[in-house]
């Protein structure tokens, strides 16, 4: 009876430079630095230019497990839940925080601007449930406390003043689900220096308005 042959390991290879490009390391100097990281980890050595495809999968897992892959200082700060890891700069489309999204990058910039100024209590009036959920998800790792008031829920002036008193910024999000009576009472209640009017819907508009306000503050 003939013995069954042991399946041979895959001999397919790929360029190491191509692997690093796939992970988002387009900058040559950074690619060189990451190459040294995987050499130290024992996945390759300085003499080799290619790597087995099977081994490349383990390299990807190693890099993603041990490092934060972010495209900017802002996205690095916003991905605060993984602060125990060192960060590596990658292309925006491979960024763990923004995934190449202009909206998410603006939110990350907003989060860093708020943090740099020691502002953490943010009151938002209006907006959709979907926008609120997205904003909470993006900022869940930041030291920012969001309180979102439904734009269709009536609030008396006394309560509005109490809410505004405890807020570092009061964002009044126009062109969303925001009744005129609700926006009016919060416009009265908020201190001028804390009030941020947003004229358009969408998180990009909100983040941009907050960033402009903080820049001119």
What are the language-model segments listed below?
Residues 72-79, 99:
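Cys/His-coordinated zinc-binding microdomains
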Residues 64-67, 91-94, 118:
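Short metal-coordination and nucleic-acid-contact micro-motifs, chiefly zinc-binding Cys/His arrays
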Residues 89-101:
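Cysteine-rich micro-motifs
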